[in-house]
């Protein structure tokens, strides 16, 4: 953690909705005049697409059917930790881009399934913003959570997460439901052991909960809408959080525990703006006087 060069980390698994949260952060940064440098978590995957397939085949032949991008070993976590530490100490660092599709390939000049070259951060940023799978990892080799000043978890209930992933991968990547189901099953071990423990490290968790039947996510025709959901927002340390103000400003919200507030799904963006804007202002203000 660094007062002078703060780091904000948003963590969630594939299909959790971290990209939507990133959009809200971008709005806050733009409105508040905050210059952020960004890391997309897949920039720190260890393998490109072809090498990942070869590694999957090798491990499957050896009897390991649990290896996935969720796994610690599939990612350059020591390098990510090093970049977090370097940024916290100096405001400098580097990242790259993983190219997913032809549209990104046209912009970057790199074939889909490969990485761009490493590039340095701009030197005049106010903070570092990370969005990905491993922004709050603590294990025997790395402590990434300890280097982030504000850690956000995005954690839909698991059936909703699966529905979102199935629909996204079918729509944008051309996968069949069966293929996505196989990926979900293969990732389950790492999901339990690598992804879920991070949400005990986060400062705030946003958990979307549908209020319609999602009991069989593999046949769901539609993703539950915001109007068909509520969002549970849990604060690790509720001291200083003005819950009466939040419940008065967010129509239909209520406190479910001393450290949790529930908001209608269509009020999530407003809730994030109200909760996160003062936190971002504080870390930026403290960085300027550090």
From Swiss-Prot:
It is an enzyme of class 2 (transferase). It catalyses: D-ribulose 5-phosphate + ATP = D-ribulose 1,5-bisphosphate + ADP + H(+). ATP binds at residues 12-20. SUPFAM superfamilies: P-loop containing nucleoside triphosphate hydrolases. One of its GO terms (biological process) is reductive pentose-phosphate cycle. Pfam families: PRK. GO terms for molecular function: ATP binding; phosphoribulokinase activity. Activated by NADH and inhibited by phosphoenolpyruvate. Pathway: Carbohydrate biosynthesis; Calvin cycle. Belongs to the phosphoribulokinase family. NCBIfam families: PRK15453.1. This is Phosphoribulokinase 1. The gene is prkA.
């Amino acid at each position: 953690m660094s007062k002078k060069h703060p780091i904000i980390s948003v963590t969630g698994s594939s299909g959790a909705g971290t990209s939507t949260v990133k959009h809200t952060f971008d709005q806050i940064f733009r409105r508040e005049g905050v210059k952020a440098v960004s890391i997309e978590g897949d920039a720190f995957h260890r393998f490109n697409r072809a090498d990942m397939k070869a590694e999957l085949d090798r491990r499957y032949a050896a009897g390991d059917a649990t290896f996935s991008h969720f796994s610690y070993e599939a990612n350059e976590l020591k390098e990510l930790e090093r970049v977090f530490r370097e940024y916290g100490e100096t405001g400098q660092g580097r990242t790259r881009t993983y190219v997913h599709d032809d549209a990104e390939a046209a912009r970057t000049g790199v074939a889909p399934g490969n990485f761009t070259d490493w590039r340095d951060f701009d030197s005049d940023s106010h903070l570092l913003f990370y969005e990905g799978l491993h922004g709050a990892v603590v294990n025997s080799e790395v402590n990434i959570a300890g280097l982030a000043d504000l850690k956000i978890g995005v954690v839909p209930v698991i059936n909703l997460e699966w529905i979102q992933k199935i629909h996204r991968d079918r729509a944008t990547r051309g996968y069949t439901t069966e293929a996505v189901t196989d990926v979900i099953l293969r990732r389950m071990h790492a999901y339990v052991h690598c992804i879920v423990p991070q949400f005990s490290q986060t400062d705030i968790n946003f958990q979307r909960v549908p209020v319609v039947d999602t009991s069989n996510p593999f046949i769901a025709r539609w993703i539950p809408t915001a109007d068909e959901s509520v969002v549970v927002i849990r604060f690790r340390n509720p001291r200083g959080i003005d819950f009466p103000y939040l419940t008065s400003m967010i129509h239909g919200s209520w406190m479910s525990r001393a450290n949790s507030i529930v908001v209608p799904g269509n009020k999530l963006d407003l809730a994030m703006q109200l909760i996160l804007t003062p936190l971002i202002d504080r870390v930026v203000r403290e960085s300027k006087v550090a």
